[in-house]
Amino acid sequence: MMLLSSSYSGGQFPGVSPLGTRPKRSTTVVPLPVVTRATAGGVRNNLEVVGNAGTLQGMDIDELRVIVRKQLQGVELSPSSYDTAWVAMVPVQGSPQSPCFPQCVEWILQNQQEDGSWGHSAGPSGEVNKDILLSTLACVLALNTWNVGQDHIRRGLSFIGRNFSVAIDGQCAAPVGFNITFSGMLHLAIGMGLKFPVMETDIDSIFRLREVEFERDAGGTASARKAFMAYVSEGLGREQDWDHVMAYQRKNGSLFNSPSTTAASAIHSCNDRALDYLVSLTSKLGGPVPAIHPDKVYSQLCMVDTLEKMGISSDFACDIRDILDMTYSCWMQDEEEIMLDMATCAKAFRLLRMHGYDVSSEGMARFAERSSFDDSIHAYLNDTKPLLELYKSSQLHFLEEDLILENISSWSAKLLKQQLSSNKIMKSLMPEVEYALKYPLYSTVDALEHRGNIERFNVNGFQRPKSGYCGSGADKEILALAVDKFHYNQSVYQQELRYLESWVAEFGLDELKFARVIPLQSLLSALVPLFPAELSDARIAFSQNCMLTTMVDDFFDGGGSMEEMVNFVALIDEWDNHGEIGFCSNNVEIMFNAIYNTTKRNCAKAALVQNRCVMDHIAKQWQVMVRAMKTEAEWAASRHIPATMEEYMSVGEPSFALGPIVPLSAYLLGEELPEEAVRSPEYGQLLRHASAVGRLLNDVMTYEKEVLTWTPNSVLLQALAAARGGGESPTPPSPACAEAARGEVRRAIQASWRDLHRLVFRDDDGSSIVPRACRELFWGTAKVANVFYQEVDGYTPKAMRGMANAVILDPLHLQQ
């Protein structure tokens, strides 16, 4: 039995219902606020945040959204002093005494820091890092190349001298290829006659680090090493085989979309296409250049991904749709900016599929084999991020035999595990990798993910190859918005929890000693598919029905006598005419009154949304469910084992109880769910696959307990069929046979996940009659089963309580 919950009463829950049977007793019921899209969206002002977003305290929330939206619509990377310096060193062809890009030289002259450096620090304290040293040395070289800015050069050399120890310190984070690029430029500077105020032994130490890098046995293959050496070509200068390097040139004329590498090739090989790329780049951007160009698609996708991870993407839905439309167009045109870059391609594929775009896995074919990684720069650097992106994207396969995604999933998971075990993953990235491997796409709890991402969020940006640290340009604003929304959501959830507790007391559900009635975990189960605050009505209905169906399941699973079961089924069958039946026990009366009155109230709310009565549909779902549970109770009493899986699942799917839970919440999502959609084959498939996932997951986890009582279970059926044993035989299957049967059932679960995934995330091109929000509710509901049945049956584990507390009750712990 799946343990879910969610439904919400928009206002005070009356002590006496005008819609049905009078509740057993009257209590004081906690009122709830009316949560609308406007209030959930955040008309709250004067933001109060702590931790590393504290500088934004008091800002209006709409002002923050404007800043984030502006950055999202036109993501611009910070200028890279390092790359600008290399572009500044390119001479005019045929006139080596003149800079080809004087605007870059001028920008360098105008942007030296007071301490003599160029570049940006990696943290709030402004400490010197290797990126600043690298950028400063490059800018000094650029100015000295054209014999300008002598005072700038002197101050730059002085800064490098004062901080030279940073360059030697192996504990300091370094841009990619630092030991090659810094030493190469140092050699070039010394050749120009520049004097560094440092000891000769320190300079020798830098050159020794260069030799160590050349001799280092890094990751990947020989091809990966060649690609890496091409990428840091500016640090090799005349030592580089520039004809070999040009094999990496892209259609836009660049090398790796890197201005610095491309500028070095223009200097040493006089390549016209490289020069054309730089001309185009500087004409677009003016004086400075970024570390990577073009990079708009990746940067925007990263920001979209960040907004989703932080739980605030709904505030920017239109902007995100525009970005994904543009990305889809680029995907369909097979543009290099997306298709050649591992991380960009994987992230684009994942986000497009998750948002309903029709993208084929053929676009990922170039990464189907592990060699695509082993031969890349990423392998040489043991770069985890592209690997993680590939693994995440591989989870989105709709077909049973999608060999491309299956291969990617297999080899990327293996490599990620190897990196974890060998401690090759950055500490800041380790929690995300561990989480991705432990919790597949269908096992995640969005609200819990949001919390973890908020608490780990780094407002100082992230490190990029050769360019130091970059951010979205709105990191502090993103964090402030996320903290504000999480706090607001928690306040809504906490009011809902108090309401659910008062609802339990009102109907006397706490008097049912046989029943698991746990509001906190029930609300958690509702939050998996329904975490936005404005979905409060749907969430409360979901929570209530989780508790009610769990109560009924416990009743049929030993909590009631056969006489009570027959009486209860008759009451549900008669529904509005239940008065003609009567109650044979106090427990039956409590159960029926709670179900009947709660359903009446929620259906009254749903009628306001749907402009029609939905009671008959919901009552029918209750009738189907209790009949199935009664059949299971009769099977257990007679020790009957169904002859086939078809016979078993015809009862097992409806007894999993999604029928009363999902439809009512779907009616309360705030948009029309037409009757023809509910009656459509598509809706039936969604319900069937979600129910199958839950039922089979439950069976896998409860087999050991149920085989002892000879309770029907899909694992038991598979094991008996494999052993050719009699269905009525009380002899349990052997452990080996049972494990093989578990494997068969797990494969059936995966098949249902794929079918459900395909139905839910299909392209919104009009081919689906069921609204997207309703389809996603089925997906989220199936996820609840996976979350709750990962280890043991149902609500009891301490981990479940901890998860519920983290989402609903516990305050955030932000980085300081």
Curated annotation (Swiss-Prot):
Mg(2+) 1 binds at D553, D557. A motif (DDXXD motif) lies at residues 553-557. It catalyses: 9alpha-copalyl diphosphate = stemod-13(17)-ene + diphosphate. Keywords: Lyase, Magnesium, Metal-binding, Plant defense. Mg(2+) 3 binds at N698, T702, E706. Residues 1-24 are annotated as: Disordered. Binds 3 Mg(2+) ions per subunit. It is an enzyme of class 4 (lyase). Its EC number is 4.2.3.34. Mg(2+) 2 binds at D553, D557. Its cofactor is Mg(2+). Residues 1-10 have a biased composition (Polar residues). It comes from the Eukaryota. The Asp-Asp-Xaa-Xaa-Asp/Glu (DDXXD/E) motif is important for the catalytic activity, presumably through binding to Mg(2+). Belongs to the terpene synthase family. Catalyzes the conversion of syn-copalyl diphosphate to stemodene. Catalyzes the committed step in the biosynthesis of the stemodane family of diterpenoid secondary metabolites, some of which possess mild antiviral activity. Also produces stemod-12-ene and stemar-13-ene as minor products. This is Stemod-13(17)-ene synthase. The lineage of its organism: Eukaryota, Viridiplantae, Streptophyta, Embryophyta, Tracheophyta.
